[in-house]
Amino acid sequence: MLNIIGIGLRGTGSLTLDEFDALRTSDIVYLDIYTSIGPKDILEKLRNIADREIIPADRNMIESESILKDAEKLNVSLLVIGDGLTATTHNQLRYSAMEKGIKVKIFENASAVNTAAGKIGLLHYKVGPPVSLPFVSSNFFPLSVIDKVKRNYDSGLHTPILIDLKDGQNMPFASAWNIIMEMQKRKGVCNNRRKCMRCLEAFISG
């Protein structure tokens, strides 16, 4: 069995009772350290509150077959910062498990994607589909990011811009801003009147 457990945005403080029960009764517990960054001491606090070992799971572990192989025979839980199914990575893991006949249980929780807009006073129905902003280089500078932002903008919608992670660290705010400005310039759609707000590891652009 595979439990995908969203633990929310406040570390152990946002664990639900059902999630805590699943955490305590699992044979193996992993903490996703690839798709999002939690509080610095989140792993230690989870271990203490559950009184058990919790294994950090990086990209290679999550995208490999190792977690699914365990889940074929044991009760396995994957702890996810935020909500359990916001990231494509976790949805793909769920589908792969189901294809193998593994029972999957999802534990929902709050994520930056579904709380950022309200946090800064925007209405949810005025927020369009999110877009990911990757680290760029001289050989990789995807302007499709701005295409998606512009599509939302032309529809009167704000855009959540999800900032990429690298080596366990968020892209600095200033770097993200400069990349967005350069992308707009290259696409010929530069508009300095647009506003970006930093919120919960995310931008809401509009």
Swiss-Prot record:
Its EC number is 2.1.1.98. One of its GO terms (molecular function) is diphthine synthase activity. It catalyses: 2-[(3S)-amino-3-carboxypropyl]-L-histidyl-[translation elongation factor 2] + 3 S-adenosyl-L-methionine = diphthine-[translation elongation factor 2] + 3 S-adenosyl-L-homocysteine + 3 H(+). Pathway: Protein modification; peptidyl-diphthamide biosynthesis. The keyword Methyltransferase applies. GO terms for biological process: methylation; protein histidyl modification to diphthamide. The keyword Transferase applies. SUPFAM superfamilies: Tetrapyrrole methylase. S-adenosyl-L-methionine-dependent methyltransferase that catalyzes the trimethylation of the amino group of the modified target histidine residue in translation elongation factor 2 (EF-2), to form an intermediate called diphthine. The three successive methylation reactions represent the second step of diphthamide biosynthesis. Homodimer. NCBIfam families: dph5 (TIGR00522). This is Diphthine synthase. The gene is dphB.
